[in-house]
Amino acid sequence: MNQLAMVNTTITRPLANYHSSVWGNYFLSYTPQLTETSSQEKRELEELKEKVRQMLVETPDNSTQKLVLIDTIQRLGVAYHFENHIKISIQNIFDEFEKNKNKDNDDDLCVVALRFRLVRGQRHYMSSDVFTRFTNDDGKFKETLTKDVSGLLNLYEATHLRVHGEEILEDALSFTVTHLKSMSPKLDNSLKAQVSEALFQPIHTNIPRVVARKYIRIYENIESHDDLLLKFAKLDFHILQKMHQRELSELTRWWKYLDYENKYPYARDKLVECYFWATGVYFGPQYKRARKTLTKLIVIITITDDLYDAYATYDELVPYTDAVERCEISAMHSISPYMRPLYQVFLDYFDEMEKELTKDGKAHYVYYAKIETNKWIKSYLKEAEWLKNDIIPKCEEYKRNATITVSSQMILITCLIVAGEFISKETFEWMINESLIAPASSLINRLKDDIIGHEHEQQREHGASFIECYVKEYRASKQEAYVEARRQIANAWKDINTDYLHATQVPTFVLEPALNLSRLVDILQEDDFTDSQNFLKDTITLLFVDSVNSTSCG
């Protein structure tokens, strides 16, 4: 008899009855032999890469062709091969613009908007005043722009890099959405697909792997596409996909070793979805160790979340919280027997992390991981305490705690620890205590989760979400609470963009995980992580199952 079966059955538990795994042992079939990259594939990739590099070198920086080429390379998911060249080119484009901006009379909306997005995407502040020439005396965008579909599409994409106070970009967003929606049915198939995908999920708030997978199909159907670029993008995606399949196979074996079904039947079986999150943060070949560590962490977070949220009693959670804070094997005897397997996984996770970091001379990084872990586990207990005492807190009090329970900052700090780069003490302290991007990413995660999971959670005993807190505090309707949550999410994105543009003392590799974590949450439809049988299943299939050479890309 397993330990859960021996737990007192008279205890009332708020069981969530989650569905079984969508994937099961599916990825075990991807053996090392099946997922090995052949020497011919490696050689062909290098040859194509050199040809694309030559295209970048030979195309003048201050030309429309260079902007389009960089944009295409980024969308196809192969920009990571040419980071330095792209960085230098965009710097040159920005410097040339700054030098001549008073003389700049470019009336091509497509070019102005594309340049704006690419320049801001490389963390250079270009003023949104570049768009005033496309407005009338009353500040409204000119109706003649509605004839320029590509211009509207590029302007729409550019608006998602806005910061606080940029009213012209707020107006541009409304203007472009209205007109792109109305004209979409009349467009040719290629342009219609681009508009439809952009309205569904703009580039800036989408994860790069999903952008690449879908754009390969769109680009293939553009008559003027470059065959060499397309071939390179497909081969690169294919090679990375095989690497991801191999990693999923290894992690599935680890998952089976944990004996999930017997030891954690109260929790969601989400190994593959957790790996999807890790890949959304770091997809490149140099981040294998980071993906493995992040996947294990997100698995631990998921099981712990379900333990606190959908199984354990408050009296069981108090000693468990204390044990996690102590992070010592001697705390094992103080917790309920059925909790011990999870606690052991937690201890093993930190032991493994410490050993790996010690090899790299970075053992002191674990200190930051443990600080964030302690904040996180205590915030769970606070939530359980509110539930036990039927407390619906004020919105600000709720957010202070709930932006910790959502675990974004703990994941973010772990990203920095395992990325393989040197991170100074000052950078850790800035990210934890001073940044806008970390709390903004946490808030997006929290509020999006509360919006999409609200109805599902009402089916059982559950702690208050932002929706309940707002309704009670402001005597508002649920619909008004949803509107407020979405407003705060939009503002949080502006905070992320602000740090990305202005926190120039912080390297880009430090900020990108927070940006990608926010993107991962933003793409979720309904309660996709919990009920991953629909949109998320299709997305995972696109990335890790379907061949990029197949005719259908979703």
UniProtKB/Swiss-Prot annotation:
The alphabetical list of record keywords is: Lyase, Magnesium, Metal-binding
- Cofactors (names): Mg(2+); Mn(2+)
The UniProt record gives the binding positions of Mg(2+) 1 as: D305, D309
Annotated catalysed reactions: (2E,6E)-farnesyl diphosphate = beta-bisabolene + diphosphate; (2E,6E)-farnesyl diphosphate = (Z)-alpha-bisabolene + diphosphate; (2E,6E)-farnesyl diphosphate = beta-acoradiene + diphosphate; (2E,6E)-farnesyl diphosphate = (E)-gamma-bisabolene + diphosphate
- Broad enzyme group: lyase
Q: Where does Mg(2+) 3 bind?
A: D449, E457
DDXXD motif, short sequence motif: residues = 305-309
EC number of this enzyme: 4.2.3.47, 4.2.3.59, 4.2.3.-, 4.2.3.15
Its pathway is:
Secondary metabolite biosynthesis; terpenoid biosynthesis
What does the record's cofactor remark say about binding? Answer: Binds 3 Mg(2+) or Mn(2+) ions per subunit.
- Residues binding Mg(2+) 2, per UniProt: D305, D309
| Keyword Magnesium in record | yes
Tissue specificity: Mostly expressed in stem trichomes.
Which terms in the Gene Ontology molecular function aspect does this entry carry? magnesium ion binding; terpene synthase activity
Q: Which GO terms describe its biological process?
A: diterpenoid biosynthetic process; terpenoid biosynthetic process
**Stored PANTHER family:** OS04G0344100 PROTEIN-RELATED, SESQUITERPENE SYNTHASE 14
State the family it belongs to. Belongs to the terpene synthase family. Tpsa subfamily.
> What is stated about domains?
The Asp-Asp-Xaa-Xaa-Asp/Glu (DDXXD/E) motif is important for the catalytic activity, presumably through binding to Mg(2+).
Q: What does this protein do?
A: Sesquiterpene synthase involved in the biosynthesis of volatile compounds. Mediates the conversion of (2E,6E)-farnesyl diphosphate ((EE)-FPP) into beta-bisabolene, beta-farnesene, (E)-gamma-bisabolene, beta-acoradiene, selinene and (Z)-alpha-bisabolene. Low or no activity with (2Z,6Z)-farnesyl diphosphate ((ZZ)-FPP). Can act with a low efficiency as a monoterpene synthase with geranyl diphosphate (GPP) as substrate, thus producing beta-myrcene and limonene.
What is this protein's record name?
Answer: Sesquiterpene synthase 14a
- In its UniProt entry, the species of origin is given as Solanum habrochaites
